[in-house]
């Protein structure tokens, strides 16, 4: 299969997202084309380093680039001040300057943290995203959102800092555990649910084959990236339309916070439950027929994904506490909760006109 290129047109901050097989092996060639950086430093995590760092270093060495690497602990808990500080001080020790390059090799956690480190290092250093999870390839590596978590909520500390290049090698996705692959699928399904019913129908027919069929996998990643790139081009800093990409995230982030950002609930699993809850709330409010949430829940179940709060193992805070966690969501304006709801599959919109009684009802019925 050929390599697909999706161009993200943001004027001086424009860049390409390259999608296909074998991109890790040709990363050196792709990176040298970026006006030849003098120094390159890699931020990754311990799990990804064991799987993919040797291939990346070999590719860079083939172009005469030596690249030191720092491997941080794997997992959402790494998106914190302590690990950010460690990464920044290490980059300074490597004497990375503005015209040099930071490579983020990993999933969404590493991409977010490395991008934020690059944003604040010397007031802005270029960086390249090499996403190694399905979630990162279709969502977090594209669009320039970088940051870390706070004990008060997810992604509350960060900056917009666009990458110089994204290399999405679909072959590396074969090293993911089935659970991690399914978690990433939560973000893929989100694109169909928020703005493209035809894509959701395609997923209903083909998603079961994504893990084993590289052609299907490449098509799903490309279409997801095309949808996100279009939205980012029209609303880079989330003043309006880009908020639609947060479908499922108001619920999902609260649930992630409630589980302590642990492996009890992966981000994509939280998004899946959040999408199901958003459609249930939409139906309860009379915005769409009950057929829509039933279809969403059925598809998530068919993919082996959680769709209810009851699917999360262990104890959780009560509904009032969950609503309190939602109040820390980035979309809150003037103290009012804002939700991405839907008039049907592929017809999402943002609103703060949500009946608290119906919200509590939806949460209670999901337990």
UniProtKB/Swiss-Prot annotation:
BP terms from Gene Ontology: amino acid biosynthetic process; aromatic amino acid family biosynthetic process; chorismate biosynthetic process
EC category name: lyase
Alphabetically ordered keywords of this record: Amino-acid biosynthesis, Aromatic amino acid biosynthesis, Cobalt, Cytoplasm, Lyase, Metal-binding, NAD, Nucleotide-binding, Zinc
Record's catalysed reaction(s): 7-phospho-2-dehydro-3-deoxy-D-arabino-heptonate = 3-dehydroquinate + phosphate
Cofactor dependency: Co(2+); Zn(2+); NAD(+)
Biological role stated in the UniProt entry: Catalyzes the conversion of 3-deoxy-D-arabino-heptulosonate 7-phosphate (DAHP) to dehydroquinate (DHQ).
Family named by the database record: Belongs to the sugar phosphate cyclases superfamily. Dehydroquinate synthase family.
PANTHER family attached to this UniProt entry: 3-DEHYDROQUINATE SYNTHASE, 3-DEHYDROQUINATE SYNTHASE, CHLOROPLASTIC
Protein name in UniProt: 3-dehydroquinate synthase
Encoding gene per record: aroB
């Amino acid at each position: 299969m050929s390599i697909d290129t999706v161009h993200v047109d943001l004027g001086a901050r424009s860049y390409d997202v390259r999608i296909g097989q074998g991109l890790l092996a040709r990363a050196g060639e792709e990176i040298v084309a970026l006006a030849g950086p003098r120094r390159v430093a890699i931020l990754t995590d311990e799990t990804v380093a064991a799987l993919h760092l040797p291939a990346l270093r070999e590719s860079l060495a083939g172009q005469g680039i030596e690249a030191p690497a720092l491997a941080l602990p794997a997992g959402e808990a790494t998106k914190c001040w302590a690990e950010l500080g460690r990464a920044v001080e290490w980059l300074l020790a490597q004497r990375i300057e503005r015209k040099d390059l930071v490579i983020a090799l990993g999933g969404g956690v590493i991409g977010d943290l490395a991008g934020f480190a690059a944003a604040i290092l010397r007031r802005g250093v270029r960086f390249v995203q090499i996403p190694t999870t399905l979630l990162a390839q279709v969502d977090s590596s594209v669009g320039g959102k970088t940051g870390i978590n706070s004990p008060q909520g997810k992604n509350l500390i960060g900056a917009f800092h666009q990458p110089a290049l994204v290399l999405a090698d679909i072959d590396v996705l074969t090293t993911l555990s089935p659970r991690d692959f399914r978690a990433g699928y939560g973000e893929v399904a989100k694109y169909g649910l928020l703005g493209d019913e035809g894509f959701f129908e395609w997923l209903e027919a083909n998603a079961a084959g994504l893990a084993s069929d590289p052609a299907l996998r490449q098509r799903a990643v490309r279409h997801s990236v095309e949808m996100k790139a279009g939205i980012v081009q029209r609303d880079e800093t989330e003043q309006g339309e880009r908020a639609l990409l947060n479908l499922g995230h108001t619920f999902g982030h609260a649930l992630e916070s409630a589980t302590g950002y642990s492996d009890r609930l992966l981000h994509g699993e939280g998004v899946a439950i959040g999408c199901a809850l958003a459609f249930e709330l939409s139906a309860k409010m009379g915005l769409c027929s009950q057929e829509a949430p039933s279809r969403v829940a059925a598809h998530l179940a068919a993919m082996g994904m959680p769709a209810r709060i009851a699917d999360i193992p262990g104890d959780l805070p009560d509904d009032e506490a969950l609503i309190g966690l939602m109040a820390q969501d980035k979309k809150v304006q003037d103290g009012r909760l804002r939700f991405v709801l839907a008039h049907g599959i592929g017809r999402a919109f943002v609103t703060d006109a949500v009946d608290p009684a119906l919200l509590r009802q939806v949460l209670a019925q999901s337990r």
